Amino acid sequence: MENLQLVLLLIGAIAIIAVLVHGFWSIRKQQPKGYKQGSMVGINRERRDAEGFDNDGIGEVRVVKSTPAEAETSKPDVNEQAPQFIEPVEEAFELSQAPAIKVNKTRVEPSLSAEAPAFTAEAPVQESLFATDEPLLAEPVIEARQAPLDVAPQEPVVDEPKQVATEALGEPQDVLVLHVVAKEGKELSGAELLPCLLTLNFKFGDLNIFHRHEDNAGTGKVLFSMANMVKPGVFDPDNMEQFSTQGVVLFMTLPCYGDALMNFSIMLNSAHQIADDLGGVLLDGGRDEWLESTKQNYIQRIRAQA
């Protein structure tokens, strides 16, 4: 590379010298005319006599200040000679431009080749960074895949107690019943009954009757249910505004899901609320007046099934 640079420098120096020599030669080429004129003037002066006239009787040329008109006429002479000086100069620039372009091209090439290793030197650094990142990214992926494996075995463990509880209920051993009936000469209106049931979180479902579930949203196991006291004991929620009945019956089977005492308390409070909203009367399972002693009897029946 150093030898190539030296050769290029020598070529550039030779080109510059050639341009300078050509310029001086062009200038010298135009000087003989003036020089000849000057020499002829000197010869003519030697041939002139004491009065200033030559052999032909012509006197010496005198320099007179030029008038504006003469100055204007003299200017074109100068301009006419100007292209003679400009033309060789233009040729000099054309000659100087050719080697200058070549020198620039050759100087750019080593700069490109010198920069190439800089990029290649950075490439392995990037590869090493990616190589170190791969195992770091792989570790959380493995953990994310193992996480569901750890959770999966817990699902049957949660379901097993529910299956055991379902099997433990078996056949109903007792049924707790409450009646809400209308007063004499009146009926319970379906238009008033439906909003009351929705407020108490009842949901229309199986057997075309209303049910109270574990969740207030109407999901989960059924705690107790409510049917129409008049046969066939069903409801039509689409025609509740035209519906009327003598009464409704709330019932809960034992054993039941969850806390039986808590479920009975919810059922009893719901029956009281329906009776108050619709102007009805609360009765026990035998359609007798609901008393405190009747309540204690129901509680004992619940404890007997515990």
Curated annotation (Swiss-Prot):
It holds the Pfam family ZipA_C. One of its GO terms (biological process) is division septum assembly. Residues 28-306 are cytoplasmic. It is a single-pass type I membrane protein. Residues 1-6 are periplasmic. The chain crosses the membrane at residues 7-27. It is found in: Cell inner membrane. GO terms for cellular component: cell division site; plasma membrane. Keywords: Cell cycle, Cell division, Cell inner membrane, Cell membrane, Membrane, Transmembrane, Transmembrane helix. Its main location: membrane. Interacts with FtsZ via their C-terminal domains. HAMAP family: ZipA (MF_00509). Essential cell division protein that stabilizes the FtsZ protofilaments by cross-linking them and that serves as a cytoplasmic membrane anchor for the Z ring. Also required for the recruitment to the septal ring of downstream cell division proteins. Belongs to the ZipA family. This is Cell division protein ZipA. The lineage of its organism: Bacteria, Pseudomonadati, Pseudomonadota, Gammaproteobacteria, Alteromonadales.
